[in-house]
């Protein structure tokens, strides 16, 4: 037997979940097509504790988060950017100064941090459970985090109902248990508040129904472990066992005094509010039994990344679904996409350092979906389409990707207002502004909505934001309307400082000879 195994090293992936209470990292490798977890790291950061009444993260909370990321960065040395995904959840969604934290994080960990929506978080949690649990049939998945609670019903890797509610064990500790005081009144108020937050979805979830309910969070794991320590051998959570836990909890006067078998010291400060939320969820949905799941958000992120490597990108399904929903003209979308990518390839060859794989994918989807707002009104098409893309639930897209797609579409026609554009942390202006220029030209050259408009020999030359489009000889004699559109487009470009669009025709072959 050879001493050295010369087979290629398995692809490794890392998923990092920046939660409101703890930061988690899980590292896995793909062996024979299966995901194998090879390491986990968890740090309690209490990020949500640092979120003030003004919705700004305190300096202390930021320091705790950055210190943890520095620790994670050590373990991630040598990982390629495409193999690492870091997601921010509720607290970073809420924090008005999240961009400041992300800017400082860039210096600590060399991978982008994606802030995901509550619904996207819920979808990824569900996928993490689906990939890691043997139970078959329709599942209800519940995750009680530090700042939000996610609830999903789905089956066979397809979420059917997806919801995220702003209630978590850290936020409820501050709201309903001031000073860490435990009493019957505080617990009941928290329980009722949780049930009330689910009021609008109760019947929808009950009617959909489920075969098995799974819990995927620190709160549910802690309840499971306390029940095991109290002698409940299967650790399943039932209404009767929740009453038992509640009775045990109410024997104590404060979080600090809390002493339950199986409850870790670090969980004391958030166990009681988490338990109250869990009771409220049971009340609202009439749950009879809840089982603990090993998989959660970070596992969902891992499988999502691995799926993209196998070209099973959920975002493509999302884009197709949206195209169907708004009945877009697929032939026109295809024409715009082909023209835009024809020019993108030329731009990329001239500006390779500015090209970004994620942005290329977003440009493709923006080209495909730029007319989703056509059903509302043609005159404000760009604004309507951008609004739909920005405010729709788009599985697979993080908040910045969704905003970027909306921005590309918002400025694909009419005036260009750079000052009105949102701030991005994952992408730089010099990377995405050329994509706006490309999409504008891709749409303009297909204004006639005919297959013959864009010449196959169209040449694009770029020098920073000074662009030249060169058309075949005598092409404009057959396409006078396109020339008029291009001349109008030149005026839009001239209104932007530093932008210039030159239009040329190749010289006559006779002259060249």
UniProtKB/Swiss-Prot annotation:
Q: Extract the SUPFAM superfamilies matched here.
A: Actin-like ATPase domain, HD-domain/PDEase-like
Q: Which InterPro entries match?
A: ATPase_NBD, Exopolyphosphatase, GppA/Ppx_hydrolase, Ppx_GppA_C, Ppx_GppA_N, PyroPPase_GppA_Ppx
**So which residues are the signal peptide here?**
none
Q: What is its EC number?
A: 3.6.1.11
Q: Which cofactor does it need?
A: Mg(2+)
Q: Which reaction does it catalyse?
A: [phosphate](n) + H2O = [phosphate](n-1) + phosphate + H(+)
Pfam families in the cross-refs: Ppx-GppA, Ppx-GppA_III
Q: In its keyword annotation, does this UniProt entry include Coiled coil? A: no
Q: Does the record's keyword annotation contain Magnesium?
A: yes
Q: How does it sit in the membrane?
A: Peripheral membrane protein
Location(s) in or outside the cell: Cell membrane
Per UniProt, the enzyme's principal EC class comes to: hydrolase
Q: Which UniProt keywords apply?
A: Cell membrane, Hydrolase, Magnesium, Membrane
GO CC annotations on file:
plasma membrane
Gene Ontology MF term list:
exopolyphosphatase activity
Its primary localisation, in coarse terms, equals: membrane
Q: Provide the family line.
A: Belongs to the GppA/Ppx family.
The UniProt subunit note reads as follows: Homodimer.
Q: What does this protein do?
A: Degradation of inorganic polyphosphates (polyP). Releases orthophosphate processively from the ends of the polyP chain.
Name this polypeptide is given: Exopolyphosphatase
């Amino acid at each position: 037997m050879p001493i050295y195994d010369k087979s290629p090293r398995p692809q490794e992936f890392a998923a990092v979940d920046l939660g409101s209470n703890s930061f988690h990292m899980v590292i896995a490798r793909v062996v024979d097509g299966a995901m194998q977890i090879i390491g986990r790291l968890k740090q309690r950061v209490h990020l949500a504790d640092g979120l003030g009444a003004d919705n700004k993260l305190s300096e202390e909370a930021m320091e705790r988060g950055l210190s943890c990321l520095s620790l994670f960065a050590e373990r991630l040395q040598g990982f390629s950017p495409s193999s690492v995904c870091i997601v921010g959840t509720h607290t970073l969604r809420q924090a008005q100064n999240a961009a400041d934290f992300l800017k400082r994080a860039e210096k600590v960990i060399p991978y982008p941090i994606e802030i995901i929506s509550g619904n996207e978080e819920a979808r990824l949690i569900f996928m993490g459970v689906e990939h890691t649990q043997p139970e078959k049939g329709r599942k209800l998945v519940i995750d009680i985090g530090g700042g939000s609670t996610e609830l999903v019903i789905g089956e066979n890797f397809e979420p059917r109902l997806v919801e995220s509610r702003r209630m978590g064990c850290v936020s409820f500790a501050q709201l309903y248990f001031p000073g860490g005081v435990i009493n019957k009144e505080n617990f009941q108020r928290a329980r009722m508040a949780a049930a009330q937050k689910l009021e609008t979805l109760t019947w929808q979830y009950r009617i959909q129904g489920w075969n098995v309910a799974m819990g995927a969070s620190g709160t549910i794991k802690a309840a499971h472990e306390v029940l095991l320590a109290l002698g409940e051998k299967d650790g399943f959570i039932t209404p009767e066992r929740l009453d038992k836990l509640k009775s045990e909890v109410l024997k104590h006067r404060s979080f600090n005094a809390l002493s339950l078998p199986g409850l870790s010291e670090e969980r004391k400060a958030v166990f009681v509010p988490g338990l109250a939320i869990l009771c409220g969820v049971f009340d609202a949905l009439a749950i009879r039994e809840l089982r603990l799941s090993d998989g959660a958000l970070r596992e969902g992120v891992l499988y999502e990344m691995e799926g993209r490597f196998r070209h099973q990108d959920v975002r493509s399904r999302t884009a197709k679904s949206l195209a169907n929903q708004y009945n877009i003209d697929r032939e026109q979308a295809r024409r715009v996409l082909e023209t835009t990518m024809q020019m993108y390839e030329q731009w990329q060859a001239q500006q390779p350092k500015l090209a970004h794989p994620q942005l290329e994918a977003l440009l493709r989807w923006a080209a495909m979906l730029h007319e989703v707002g056509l059903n509302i009104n043609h005159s404000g098409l760009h604004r309507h389409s951008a609004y739909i893309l920005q405010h729709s639930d788009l599985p697979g897209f993080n908040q910045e990707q969704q905003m970027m797609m909306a921005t590309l579409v918002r400025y694909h026609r009419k005036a260009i207002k750079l000052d009105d554009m949102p701030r991005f942390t994952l992408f730089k202006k010099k990377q995405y502004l050329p994509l706006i220029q490309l999409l504008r030209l891709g749409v303009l050259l297909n204004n006639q909505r005919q297959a013959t408009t864009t010449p196959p020999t169209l040449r694009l030359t770029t020098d920073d934001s000074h662009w030249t489009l060169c058309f075949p000889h005598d092409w404009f004699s057959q396409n006078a309307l396109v020339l008029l559109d291009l001349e109008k487009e030149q005026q839009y470009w001239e209104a932007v400082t530093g932008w210039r669009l030159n239009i040329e025709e190749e010289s006559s072959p006779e002259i060249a000879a």
